[in-house]
Every structure is written in structure tokens, then in C-alpha cells.
């Protein structure tokens, strides 16, 4: 029995006003080819198929077309909802998908099922667990403090997994089949990136890996970096197939090829997802940024490299956007973001905390607040204009 474990596609993501359609199409084409090459029996998508609850039409088209094309290979597809997915959006095509060898699990309450091989024989027992919304698994209780709410939710998630595993064992019976569980949540020790949202805000930071049942493989989603959890080879995040934030660029992206033999986990192989949209982060003062940009001088690059430029100088130059534009206009790059480095923002905030409002003019307060936002030059100019107009209006009313 062979499966491909993938997650966090985020179809339809708007990345600083840029579409990811071409990248996602290339990934899905590669995934289809990979499933055929390795004669995979099933593909498990562990949540966040879409980036929003109301994905754009092209994202739905990518999803639907992939399901149709995969059906021709005999490979079964299991799609589980993540915290970004809308239950209603996934469920609207669930019955049609069932005729296309695809199981859609959008919410809690789905019992374990037999996952077939390509030839139709039983291959594994699947505990199809999507993102568990608190309202689906716990009853609200009045009077609980924060710690009690956290313990209540932790116990509910643990019980849900343990009950599903017990039901899976009954379904398996005496058959030599592995048990595969899924999940879409943060586990203790997982390394997150900037694009990952907290999903149990104020109640549960992370789920302890030791609370998972002893399934043969646990296919997790929500964290965008591939990683093994708690030193347990069978508990894994595969990560997203493309970088979803600039702090993910430069790191390999994977799909896990998981092989079972005689009802047990045999191997997990990381398959590198090809990069189709280059991205880079440049960090330093203006002179350093200028030097780093030279690596693309006289280079033919298609598509252009998407850049995040982090300025580390003490003085965040007012016309930095214009200077960066002049430096890059003849290079095969596209600057999507210009900002202070995180360390610089923290230093600026720390120094400003020693000042009082009485020491600053209204304009200084506004300019410092504006500098903390990641806005392009046109947006900054518009806000500056609106602010200046407002000041003049207020001054006129005061004089009147």
C-alpha cells in the first residue's frame, strides 16, 4: 500500500496582489505525474485545500480538474478540511466527488473507512479526521476559566482521536491492514512559519504528540514546513507544496511517499516539489541591498524573482521605495515587499517607548505609525495626503 501525504495547498492565495495559479497548476500536474510514476494507491490532502472559505473560480477549477484527471489513474483521493476551508464549500461537491473516487471530509463525525488499493482490494483503515472545530466536539460550559477551557478542549480532541482509533481497530478486525489517521492542528514542538494562523486562539496552543493514538501513520496538516514530531517517524507534517510566506522561501518543499507492508509502516520518502516561482529575501542597508541585487545582473530569468527587501538601517529612508525601484527596474526581479527588518522595528519601538506624546508633534506620531506598516509608496503617499488634508481641515475649523 502506497500513499502520498500532502497538505496546505491554499489554492486561490493572493500573495501581495500576486496570483499563485501558475505555481499551483504546475504542482498539481507534478502530483498527478508522481502518483502515476510511483503507482500510488491513495493521495491524502490533510487540510487547507483552499486559502479562503470563498475561493476564486480559478481555484475551484484547479481542484475540480485535478480530481477528474486523477480519477483516470485509479488512485483514490481523500480531501480533509483545514481551518481555512469552508465546510459548505467542500460539501457542495462532495456527492459528485464520491463518483470520482474521491472522499471529502469537511467536518467531524466521519467514521473510519477502508482505503482501497488501485485494484480495489483493502489497503488500509483510515481515520479521516479534519480540522476539529471546538463547537463540533465540545459542549460549551459556563464558568470555566482559561486553563479549564484549555483542558476541556484538549481532552475532547484526545477522546475524539482515541475513539476513532478504537473504531478503526474494530473495522480492521483480523485483516493485516495499517491504520492511518489524519489531523489539521498544531502539535507541541512544531516549527511554524509566518503564514500559519493560530487555530484554537485563547484555548489551546498545541496538541501533545503523545496524546495521539498508536496508529501506523499520522498524516498532519496546518504547519507549512515538513517535519517529524516528537522524534516519532510515523507522526509527520508534509508542509505546503509552495512557499506561502517569504520566510518559507529557500526551503525545500515536499510530498511524503508513504509505503506500508504487511500491515505496518515500511518507509517514508520525501519527494521534492519542483520550484516554479523563484523567491528571495534580501536584508541589509541600501549599499548591501544594491550589492545583493547584482546577482541578477545580465541574467535571463523567467518568471522574475519575487523579492522581499528588509532594510536594517537606523533611518528608514523616506524615499526608499523609489530608490529600490530605480535599482531593480532593469533586473529580472519584482519587488513585492519593502519593510524594516523585524529586529529594526523592535529597536525603534523600544526607543520610542521612552518618549512621551508631549515630546512629539502630531506629524511625528503619524509618520512613526505609518513606518510600521508594510505599504508601497503609492499607499504611503495617499495616506500622507489624507492625513495632511485632515490636519488642514481641523486647523481651519479651529481658526473659524
UniProtKB/Swiss-Prot annotation:
It holds the Pfam family SbcD_C. Keywords: DNA recombination, DNA replication, Endonuclease, Exonuclease, Hydrolase, Nuclease. InterPro entries: Calcineurin-like_PHP_ApaH, DNA_Repair-Maintenance_Comp, Metallo-depent_PP-like, Mre11_N, SbcD, SbcD_C. It comes from the Bacteria. GO terms for biological process: DNA recombination; DNA repair; DNA replication; DNA replication termination. GO terms for cellular component: DNA repair complex. One of its GO terms (molecular function) is DNA exonuclease activity. Belongs to the SbcD family. Heterodimer of SbcC and SbcD. SbcCD cleaves DNA hairpin structures. These structures can inhibit DNA replication and are intermediates in certain DNA recombination reactions. The complex acts as a 3'->5' double strand exonuclease that can open hairpins. It also has a 5' single-strand endonuclease activity. This is Nuclease SbcCD subunit D. It comes from Escherichia coli (strain K12).
Amino acid at each position: 500500500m502506497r500513499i502520498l501525504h500532502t497538505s496546505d495547498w491554499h489554492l486561490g492565495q493572493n500573495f501581495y496582489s500576486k496570483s499563485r495559479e501558475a505555481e499551483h497548476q504546475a504542482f498539481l500536474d507534478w502530483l498527478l505525474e508522481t502518483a502515476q510514476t510511483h503507482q500510488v494507491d491513495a493521495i491524502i490532502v490533510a487540510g487547507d485545500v483552499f486559502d479562503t472559505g470563498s475561493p476564486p473560480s480559478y481555484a475551484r477549477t484547479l481542484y475540480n480538474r485535478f480530481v477528474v484527471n486523477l480519477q483516470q489513474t485509479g488512485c483514490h483521493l481523500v480531501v480533509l478540511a483545514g481551518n481555512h476551508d469552508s465546510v459548505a464549500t467542500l460539501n457542495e461537491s462532495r456527492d459528485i466527488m464520491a463518483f470520482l473516487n474521491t472522499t471529502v471530509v469537511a467536518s467531524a463525525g466521519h467514521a473510519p473507512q477502508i482505503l482501497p488499493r488501485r485494484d480495489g482490494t483493502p489497503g488500509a483503515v483510515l481515520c479521516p479526521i479534519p480540522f476539529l472545530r471546538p463547537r463540533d466536539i465540545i459542549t460549551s460550559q459556563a464558568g470555566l476559566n482559561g486553563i479549564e477551557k484549555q483542558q476541556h478542549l484538549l481532552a475532547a480532541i484526545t477522546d475524539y482521536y482515541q475513539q476513532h482509533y478504537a473504531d478503526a481497530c474494530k473495522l480492521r478486525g483480523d485483516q493485516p491492514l495499517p491504520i492511518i489517521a489524519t489531523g489539521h492542528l498544531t502539535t507541541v514542538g512544531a516549527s511554524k512559519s509566518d503564514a500559519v494562523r493560530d487555530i484554537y486562539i485563547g484555548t489551546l496552543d498545541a496538541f501533545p504528540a503523545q496524546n495521539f493514538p498508536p496508529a501506523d501513520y499520522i498524516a498532519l496538516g496546518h504547519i507549512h514546513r515538513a517535519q517529524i514530531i516528537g522524534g516519532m517517524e510515523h507522526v509527520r507534517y508534509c508542509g505546503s507544496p509552495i512557499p506561502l510566506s517569504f520566510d518559507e522561501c529557500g526551503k525545500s518543499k515536499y510530498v511524503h511517499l508513504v509505503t506500508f507492508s504487511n500491515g505496518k509502516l515500511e518507509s517514508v520518502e520525501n519527494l521534492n516539489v519542483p520550484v516554479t516561482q523563484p523567491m528571495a529575501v534580501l536584508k541589509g542597508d541600501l549599499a548591501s541591498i544594491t550589492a545583493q541585487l547584482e546577482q541578477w545582473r545580465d541574467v535571463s530569468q523567467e518568471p522574475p524573482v519575487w523579492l522581499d527587501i528588509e532594510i536594517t538601517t537606523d533611518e528608514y529612508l523616506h524615499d526608499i521605495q523609489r530608490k529600490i525601484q530605480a535599482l531593480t527596474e532593469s533586473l529580472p526581479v519584482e519587488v513585492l515587499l519593502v519593510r524594516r527588518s523585524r529586529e529594526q522595528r523592535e529597536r525603534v519601538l523600544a526607543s520610542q517607548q521612552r518618549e512621551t506624546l508631549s515630546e512629539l508633534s502630531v506629524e511625528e506620531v503619524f509618520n512613526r505609525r505609518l513606518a510600521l506598516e508594510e505599504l508601497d509608496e503609492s499607499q504611503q503617499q495617499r495616506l500622507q495626503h489624507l492625513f495632511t488634508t485632515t490636519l488642514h481641515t481641523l486647523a481651519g475649523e479651529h481658526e473659524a
